């Protein structure tokens, strides 16, 4: 029985059913044992097999017209059948709330939130019209704030799981209740605040799986210093113990770090009572929780949580709910309350998904030629006028990254860099920065092309839904002499989790993802927050049958299963 599928309190309650999707296999990683019986053990299991068969028979005729029917085409990636989601109450709430003024947030926090979102929006190409006056909450922000704020200052432990599609504003969905919680402590309990204000302590913690995510989340959190007077601090690989100690002495309101770093707090000799430093932490968030609770992370993450004795709010946040994550939540945190949006596990509305079969002419089985021609078409079309173009290429195996980068640069004249887990933290930070930053205007980009602009001759690839451009004065291999105006990053799933590639409009899936989880996260690096974006999936004779249905499911708004 799964926590996200059955009611926790009574049969009359019905939490939204959460679909099960395939999960990746991880080597090793101990499982944490959970003592005691889950309160779910006595929950009724629902209809009998006979009733289920009758219901299935009755619905069979309407299968094609069901908008919530999950995509289950082919067997590649171990896709599993979905179940319907009951989202009536969530939909009504989303339709009812049209601005932040309708949400239970302190006025200073509300103003600060609008300012932060407005500044973030101004960094994007098509969001220049947004100001703090017309900023509205996204669906997941509406639902999360409404439900968490209902009992925000209740001292008992409250556990929530926020789950929504990629690029939907999940960071602010948990950050707004967190900030509101801290400011209400100051305003509503002045005596308590007086004991905390000048003490050596940490008040809240945000845990993420990578140091890149530490930097990204901290960039947003740090804006609360000038707007609300909150002291935030990031603890990553570049942070010295001395810097950490100095900030703890001055009170850290929001600490952003990884579970491993947090556990290191107990091995720093200069801190004699690390347990006391964490004793006032009341709000803890696990961002990218499906990663932090998978088999390779579970022991470390669970150990970090257990070191925080007085948690008031524990928030799990994720864009996908894999089966293994669902089981882990049920075992370790059986009272968790799910908060989800109707578009969970659906690909973005604004996504343009194209499938290219490299087995056909003119590529004749060469995926690298199909990739080079796709990049060339991107660099020469009329999209993103006035801005530098960027593209992220995802591969399944890190060993293939150097070879692809070398071929793109030396044989096909592209401007590509590779990034894998073997790079140092400093190298990764330097390589990824141009993609995490807003797109640069072309006036700021140094011209690197070795050939002048040339007119395009278009042709359509057979058995494909993509039109490729071709230069009249190409090299013998059919590519342009140089395509330096397009900045290309070749990487693995290391960079597919949580990172906000600001304004990146193009993603290429060089390999078909192994699971629907990987597909959602890779595709989610573009078309974020209702921006436009394109995904080009390269297939071959083995994977074309599974991939060809993906463009249709986006148009039909179907859910991946």
UniProtKB/Swiss-Prot annotation:
Example of a GO cellular component annotation carried by this entry: nucleolus
Q: What top-level branch of life does the organism fall under?
A: Eukaryota
Annotated region (Disordered), positions in chain: 29-72
SMART domains the UniProt entry points to: DEXDc, HELICc
Q: Where does ATP bind?
A: 164-171
Report the residue ranges where the short sequence motif DEAD box is annotated in this entry.
287-290
Q: Which InterPro entries match?
A: DEAD/DEAH_box_helicase_dom, Helicase_ATP-bd, Helicase_C-like, P-loop_NTPase
Task: Give the location in the cell.
Answer: Mitochondrion
What catalytic activity is recorded?
A: ATP + H2O = ADP + phosphate + H(+)
Q: Name one GO molecular function term.
A: RNA helicase activity
Give the main EC class: hydrolase
Q: Could you point out where the transit peptide sits in the sequence?
A: 1-26
The annotated consequence of residue 438 to S reads:
In strain: DBY947
User: Which SUPFAM superfamilies does this one have?
Assistant: P-loop containing nucleoside triphosphate hydrolases
Helicase ATP-binding domain boundaries = 151-339
Miscellaneous field: Present with 736 molecules/cell in log phase SD medium.
What family name appears in the similarity comment?
Belongs to the DEAD box helicase family. MRH4 subfamily.
Which comment does the entry carry about domains? Answer: The Q motif is unique to and characteristic of the DEAD box family of RNA helicases and controls ATP binding and hydrolysis.
Name this protein carries in UniProt: ATP-dependent RNA helicase MRH4, mitochondrial
Give the taxonomic lineage as stored in the record. Eukaryota, Fungi, Dikarya, Ascomycota, Saccharomycotina
